[in-house]
Amino acid sequence: MAALRAVCSLRGVGAQVLRAGSGIRLPSQPSRGARRWQPDIEWAEQFSGAVMYPSKETAHWKPPPWNDVDVLKEKVVTNVTLNFGPQHPAAHGVLRLVLELSGEMVRKCDPHIGLLHRGTEKLIEYKTYLQALPYFDRLDYVSMMCNEQAYSLAVEKLLNIQPPPRAQWIRVLFGEITRILNHIMAVTTHALDIGAMTPFFWMFEEREKMFEFYERVSGARMHAAYIRPGGVHQDLPLGLMDDIYEFSKNFSLRIDEVEEMLTNNRIWRNRTVDIGVVSAEDALNYGFSGVMLRGSGIQWDLRKTQPYDVYDQVEFDVPIGSRGDCYDRYLCRVEEMRQSLRIIEQCLNKMPPGEIKVDDAKVSPPKRAEMKTSMESLIHHFKLYTEGYQVPPGATYTAIEAPKGEFGVYLVSDGSSRPYRCKIKAPGFAHLAGLDKMSKGHMLADVVAIIGTQDIVFGEIDR
């Protein structure tokens, strides 16, 4: 066995001589043009830190930086992710927000929806046009009859029928009662979220009186199913118009009391002025409607621009804001309640006599007295409520000025007694999409005020 053997090194480092049995590598004379050897990273790291007397503590020591700039890990602040809702009392139902906070400031707001999804639009396709009506009460369950009104107008447009004048006046009357119901809920719960409890208790007593009007006319306090295609279900009972007049006469005093407590209140103004500001351009780009649009200074009200039923025969003003903040939207809602009282008084004074259902046997069921004497009327009633009436093929988009904004129904008929497709346009969906824009840069407590001013109900958003 030879004492020495030559081993050619790889990558031009040079030949190395390996002594037999020793394991010691001796670098040979580098050849001409060979590259200089560079230590690898692992070789260099073994000399970093404390090398003199290594121990468990000193092994992790590092030399100080040469430029005297050392970033400590304790000073690196990361944003906090906070889950707001769906159990939070200020979430107005089942709203879940994923908030990214920098300290107390909101950097990002991500709404998560769908926790109240019930598949309403699909369920409607399996019901007749009359059986689908109660689903609309349960969409925006704070303004029930306004939803019914939009659906009934859409079906009437496809059927090419028009309800009698008395039915139209009754619709407008209860549509404005519903608007007051909604705005009471919006304003007082907004105040309750911020910390003012008294208006909530004051105004809910008035709200109970309006629920009584609902009950006297339909039998139900909330989900009335009263406004139907072709008119309304029943005529107004005796004495109801007198009681509505007494209510409207005294209700303006309740509004004055709430305004006296809130409008010039220092705490209320600090919590709402310049909070959640939306410019007119942003409001249009996000698809806002209703008070959210009018609060930014755009005078757009479907009762004025595209009148339905008898809104072209009543006089009222459309309040608009100037700054587009929470305070302006509060003032708009309060003034809209006063304008609704004006419309209610005009409806009571101009209420005509006559029928409350369209004179069309294919749509309107026979009267109870006829059913007790005529077998044909009984059969007609049975067929109408089991099979329904056939609607000519076509499609329509019908929108009304609901209390929260533009509530639209896109209805497609294929000629059968069931809708082929019913698409519901909820105003709160677009408002919730703008929550990130409205709350960015505000404090965490201001997010509650912004949710309250949007007047969100998840029955119509999740559907």
Curated annotation (Swiss-Prot):
Cofactor annotation: [4Fe-4S] cluster
EC number: 7.1.1.2
Compartment(s) of residence: Mitochondrion inner membrane
UniProtKB keywords: 4Fe-4S, Acetylation, Electron transport, Iron, Iron-sulfur, Membrane, Metal-binding, Methylation, Mitochondrion, Mitochondrion inner membrane, NAD, Oxidoreductase, Respiratory chain, Transit peptide, Translocase, Transport, Ubiquinone
Co-factor binding comment: Binds 1 [4Fe-4S] cluster.
Catalytic class of the enzyme: translocase
InterPro entries with a match to the protein in the record: NADH_Q_OxRdtase_suD, NADH_UbQ_OxRdtase_49kDa_CS, NDH1_su_D/H, NiFe-Hase_large
GO biological process: cellular response to oxygen levels; gliogenesis; mitochondrial ATP synthesis coupled electron transport; mitochondrial electron transport, NADH to ubiquinone; mitochondrial respiratory chain complex I assembly; neural precursor cell proliferation; neurogenesis
Record flagged with keyword Electron transport: yes
Domain of life: Eukaryota
Described function: Core subunit of the mitochondrial membrane respiratory chain NADH dehydrogenase (Complex I) which catalyzes electron transfer from NADH through the respiratory chain, using ubiquinone as an electron acceptor. Essential for the catalytic activity of complex I. Essential for the assembly of complex I. Redox-sensitive, critical component of the oxygen-sensing pathway in the pulmonary vasculature which plays a key role in acute pulmonary oxygen-sensing and hypoxic pulmonary vasoconstriction. Plays an important role in carotid body sensing of hypoxia.
Annotated family: Belongs to the complex I 49 kDa subunit family.
PANTHER family: NADH DEHYDROGENASE [UBIQUINONE] IRON-SULFUR PROTEIN 2, MITOCHONDRIAL, NADH-UBIQUINONE OXIDOREDUCTASE 49 KDA SUBUNIT
Protein name: NADH dehydrogenase [ubiquinone] iron-sulfur protein 2, mitochondrial
Species this protein is from: Rattus norvegicus (Rat)
Gene name tied to this protein: Ndufs2
